[in-house]
Amino acid sequence: MVVVTIFTTACNINRPPGQDVPAVTSDTLHVEKVDNLPEDFILGMDTSCVPALEACGVKYYDHDGEETDVYEILSRNGINYIRVRVWNDPYDSQGNGYGGGNCDIENAIAIGKRATKYGMKLLVDFHFSDFWADPGKQMIPIVWQNMDYDKKRESLYAYTRDQLQMLIDAGVDVGMVQIGNETNGAFCGESSSVPGGWKRIMELISAGSKAVREICPEALVAVHFTNPENVDSYFSYGKNLEYYQVDYDVFASSYYPYWHGTLDNLAQVLSDIAQRYGKKVMVAETSYAYTAADSDFFANTIGEGGNVNNYPFTQQGQASLVRDVIDTLANRTTGGIGVFYWEGTWISAGGDDWEQNYALWEKYGSGWASSYAAEYDPDDAGRWYGGCAVDNQAFFDANGYALESLKVFRLVREGNIVENSPNAF
């Protein structure tokens, strides 16, 4: 993430304090070494739903079949950074969770403490919304809805400051803070499509950045966009950040290969940002399927026929895609500092049928949205609530056992050549 000193702890990858970590080997997974991979290169994973899944009874198992803390499993296999989303107040007026992990600050603290225990830094992803913020919606938190703009900006600053202080007080190793999630022309109820919209968006981002600098002066500040295939839009984001003098370190992009174009384009777009504005760049979200099958009785984002050329829906295909994204950021992108995999631990809640899983999603918030989210987001979550849509893109099977493909995060550093590697395992 830029400055080497910031990564001193993070680069002690796969080695929780006081523990030796055995080498990772594989007889079936073919991984070409990523040359010139810096020791402090970020190999991260979003795990925001883990506590909700564990509340449902989900357990995680290492490659020897032993039940193990999932954060220890991730650390052993090369993950050196954990990402967690934070929503302002993801509960309805009766205290029922909206789902998607019910990702409030308490959830972030619980995850952050476990990540820190196993030698991993935390990226805090503030959505500045009560539920999902993405290119389709950037809804303002309910408690800010009746505020004028100046009061909202002040509240965003104070909220960011106070939430970060809670994480620091809990002993969490915060390495990076993301101000907004996939803020493509909108943020916290503001839109670039109206006069003065960009100015307001950038001032709000600056308010969040100011809080980070005060509470976590050594942490990196990241901004996050998506759809890198829309090259002109990325140039617009970069120009506006520069014009309004936003204080940030990292320009982050989502990259889902089945939506977002080629790796060549990704490298070119991010390199241009890095060269023009002197910023670090990274992939904040990526993922790929190891199977076309669904395991929780709720339709997946991608399935049969959705694969990208050269990457079959197998564990080998999943690992190869991840390896190539890492290589693209490390060797073909100016200023590339890392890659985060999105929700590689989000698996089935464990029910034997849809009805059992639905009850778990509603009670513990382990699906993408509960029916209670309709109070806040009636048009999307209120219509399509349900389970996990990415369980076939996790690094654990439906029963919580680590896949062979998870080893890719370790094997990219040394390589693991398997002749005639099967694409079907």
Which residue ranges define each predicted feature?
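Active-site cleft segment of glycoside hydrolase catalytic domains centered on the general acid/base Glu
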Residues: 97-98, 102-109, 133-240, 246, ...
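Bacterial signal peptide processing site
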Residues: 12-14
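C-terminal motif of bacterial Sec signal peptides marking the signal peptidase cleavage site
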Residues: 7-10
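Aromatic-rich peripheral "rim/lid" segments of glycoside hydrolase catalytic domains that contact
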Residues: 29, 33, 272, 291-307, ...
